[in-house]
């Protein structure tokens, strides 16, 4: 079943063939994320879609929670793991710690990132805090203000 779009500006609808290019074994995904996925078909579609987002953008920005094992909580963490795998500039706003972090030298380092590439990806938790909203607004203001 198709998903209902919440917005109509620049949607990209992926064909079955395009989705398959982002396919990955659930075993590998579970191992990379240090967790187990049960609703495999639903989760597979989400992971396939996230693959295309990260593959099309260069710099990756995520809002979520960095866990002790350096992964990021939830499905959002898949965008983070792919960005690490693809060697992309990667930044996470950790809502719990209320700060931006950049993945550098195999660890999270506090940072104040800017959008500085022609293409970027935004991903994140569906539980966006007021702080998270402010962080996104500030990221755009700092990146694009003259």
Residue ranges of each PLM-predicted region?
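Acidic/glycine-enriched connector segments
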Residues: 1-145
């Amino acid at each position: 079943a198709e998903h209902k779009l919440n917005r109509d500006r620049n949607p990209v609808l992926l064909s079955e063939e395009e989705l398959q290019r982002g396919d990955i074994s659930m075993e590998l995904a579970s191992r990379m994320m240090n967790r187990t996925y049960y609703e495999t078909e639903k989760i597979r579609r989400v992971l396939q879609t996230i693959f295309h987002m990260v593959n099309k953008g260069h710099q990756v920005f995520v809002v979520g929670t960095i866990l002790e094992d350096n992964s990021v909580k939830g499905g959002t963490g898949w965008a983070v793991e792919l960005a690490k795998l693809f060697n992309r500039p990667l930044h996470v706003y950790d809502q719990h710690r209320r700060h931006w972090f950049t993945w550098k030298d195999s660890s999270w380092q506090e940072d104040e990132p800017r959008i500085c590439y022609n293409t970027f990806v935004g991903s994140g938790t569906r539980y966006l805090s007021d702080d998270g909203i402010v962080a996104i607004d500030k990221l755009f203001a700092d990146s694009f203000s003259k």
